[in-house]
């Protein structure tokens, strides 16, 4: 925000996870980090919540950022002001290497020209498309569909994180509804009637008052998933080509930590003990035969 002058919508609004029974709550992996809400407290926090939810966990330390509408615009402007150049509409066709040392990439420009960009080091961070560029990265797309509905301002203050659906309230009353998990969809584009129906049922399951609010937008994306659903961060088999991919549903959440790790690897900066543990856990070699 300070570099771009654009408000990214970052705020600590808190997340509530509702449960139908207390046993499910006790099994929740981050139970110890949340505040228990009994039925009255849960309904005081979220007026209009579906009555089937009897218990809740409030994670007051968590929040949100408007990554789709604001964050990417802010990031692009901040990068441009610091000398970063973008080639929009270009497609990486091939990695250029010699004696297993990275030299650059060959790309197809938006105007159809085949050009080469030479550099000393590079980071492969191409999301669900990473495997198409570097075949050693075992990443496949898992499609997700989303929509937004328009509600009254301040109608919903907390994020509701249900077992199948989540609702994220923005400051202007818009509520983001996500997201389907379509493992067999590949790179098939577009929203589908079945996907929208699933999201609409999710709204009713969590927050019935919003089921008839007008739809504002529908969209979709492709999550980059590895076989163990954990990211790949570290050095590749090609010297000076680094990997930061496969974050699945946690790309925005892990973006700051990933960038710091990759920066340290590229600049040969010493890692602290926690960073060493992350690198060991997410190293690409775990998938090599």
Could you tell me what each predicted segment is?
Residues 1-46, 54-55, 202:
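Dinucleotide-binding Rossmann-like beta1-alpha1 core, especially the glycine-rich loop
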Residues 10-12, 86-87, 140-144, 208-220, ...:
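A short coil-to-beta-strand element that immediately follows conserved catalytic motifs
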Residues 38-39, 72, 88-90, 217-219:
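Short loop/edge segments at beta-strand edges and connector loops
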Residues 48-54, 96-104, 225-229, 236-239:
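A short, glycine/Asx- and small/polar-enriched loop/turn
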Residues 58-121, 125:
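Helical element adjacent to the flavin cofactor pocket in flavoenzyme catalytic cores
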Residues 68, 213-289:
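C-terminal catalytic lobe of FAD-dependent flavoproteins
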Residues 108-161, 189-193, 209, 273:
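Central helical "cap/lid" subdomain
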Residues 153-239:
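Active-site lid/adjacent beta-loop-alpha segment flanking the redox-cofactor pocket in flavoenzymes
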């Amino acid at each position: 925000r300070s570099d771009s002058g654009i408000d990214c919508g970052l705020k600590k609004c808190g997340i509530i996870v509702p449960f139908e029974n207390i046993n499910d709550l006790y099994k929740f992996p981050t139970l110890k980090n949340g505040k228990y809400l009994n039925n009255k407290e849960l309904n005081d926090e979220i007026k209009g919540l579906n009555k089937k939810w009897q218990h809740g966990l409030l994670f007051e330390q968590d929040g949100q950022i408007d990554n789709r509408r604001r964050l990417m615009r802010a990031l692009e402007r901040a990068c441009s002001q610091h000398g970063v150049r973008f080639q929009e509409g270009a497609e990486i066709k091939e990695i250029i290497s010699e004696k297993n040392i990275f030299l650059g990439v060959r790309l197809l420009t938006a105007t159809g020209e085949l050009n080469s960009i030479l550099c000393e080091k590079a980071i492969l961070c191409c999301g669900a498309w990473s495997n198409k560029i570097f075949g050693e990265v075992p990443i496949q797309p898992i499609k997700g569909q989303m929509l937004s509905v328009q509600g009254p301002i301040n109608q919903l203050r907390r994020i509701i994180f249900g077992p199948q659906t989540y609702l994220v309230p923005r400051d202007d009353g818009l509520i983001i509804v996500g997201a389907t998990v379509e493992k067999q969809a590949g790179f098939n584009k577009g929203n589908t009637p079945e996907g929208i129906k699933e999201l609409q049922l999710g709204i009713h399951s969590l927050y019935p008052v919003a089921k008839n609010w007008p739809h504002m937008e529908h969209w979709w994306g492709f999550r980059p998933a590895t076989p163990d659903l954990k990211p790949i961060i570290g050095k590749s088999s090609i010297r000076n080509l680094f990997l930061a991919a496969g974050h699945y549903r946690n790309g925005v959440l892990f973006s700051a930590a990933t960038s710091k790790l990759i920066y340290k690897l590229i600049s040969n900066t010493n890692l602290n003990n926690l960073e060493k543990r992350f690198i060991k856990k997410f190293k690409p070699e775990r998938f090599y035969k």
